[in-house]
Each structure stands twice: as structure tokens, then as C-alpha cells.
Amino acid sequence: MNNKIKLIKEDITQLEVDAIVNAANSSLLGGGGVDGAIHRAGGPEILEECYKIREKQGECKVGEAVITTAGRLNAKFIIHTVGPIWSGGNKNEDELLSNAYKNSLLLAKNHSLKTIAFPNISTGIYHFPKERAAKIAIQSVTEFLKQDNQIQTVFFVCFDFENLEIYNKLLQTYK
């Protein structure tokens, strides 16, 4: 199981995988952090596709996910998911964050994708506690992979050394 999960510190926009996950906001129109970086690196076609999705379904709800092509990125697709804003833990944040991971994996599976890369969802400007978020991420992905063997590799892509150390420590308990 754990050989399907890889931990790296990289620029997620540079990865050659089937899908990178964008920690988007509900508007799907780009923003700060990884969301802004993906939109800038991928080019305007990503935003155009996001507008089309909004026309069909409206905003993307917290915990849900949608898929677009990847524009100029090396990845084939971008899965945009909306993580929860941390509000002290009393507003279903854990379940919503778990759903963001699970729904992203489900979209990848439904599109026959084999490699997917996740950023540290909700841990930036949404202020989700990093260790708590990492536990939820690892648990959600591990549970999904137990039920599905189509997805071959899941990358947890850490932006900083703090998240890298947290994930590295927690992944040891899943070996």
C-alpha cells in the first residue's frame, strides 16, 4: 500500500503526472497560493474551462471536485477541489477535507488516471492545522487505495519543509 504513496518537496506545477490537484476556492477563478500558481503556469485555457464549469453547475462546493485539462502544464489534467476554511474544528472541517481528497481520487479513477499529485490542501490561507490536515490526507488516500487498485501512485507534494517533515513522520506509521 505505502509503495503507492510518494512524498516529495517540489513545485507541483512542474510535475509530469496524469493529474495535479488544485486547492481551489469555490469560485474556480484562481486565487493565491497553489491555486494562483497553477493558473499562472497553466495559462488562460484553464480559467476558460473553469468558467464553462461554473456556467453548468455554479460554484464548486467545499469538499467537491471538478476536472479540467492542464493547459501548458506537464500534467494531463487538473482536478480542482475546494478544501474547508478552518473555523476551530466545529464546522465539519475534518469530513469536508477528507471529502476533498476522496472526491479528487474518485474523479481520477473515473477518468482512468493512474498518477495524481496533491498539494497540502487547506493548510495555507485557510489555516487548517498542518498536522491534523496531513493525518486526514493520509488516512483518506490510504482508505481509497485499499478499495481501488487502478490508481498506481499518489504524490503528496509539500511546498515547505514543515509539511514535508509532518508527512514524513506520519507516513512512517502507515508502513
From Swiss-Prot:
Residues 1-175 form the Macro domain. SUPFAM superfamilies: Macro domain-like (SSF52949). InterPro entries: Macro_dom (IPR002589), Macro_dom-like (IPR043472). PROSITE patterns: MACRO (PS51154). It holds the Pfam family Macro. Belongs to the MacroD-type family. This is Macro domain-containing protein LA_4133. It comes from Leptospira interrogans serogroup Icterohaemorrhagiae serovar Lai (strain 56601).
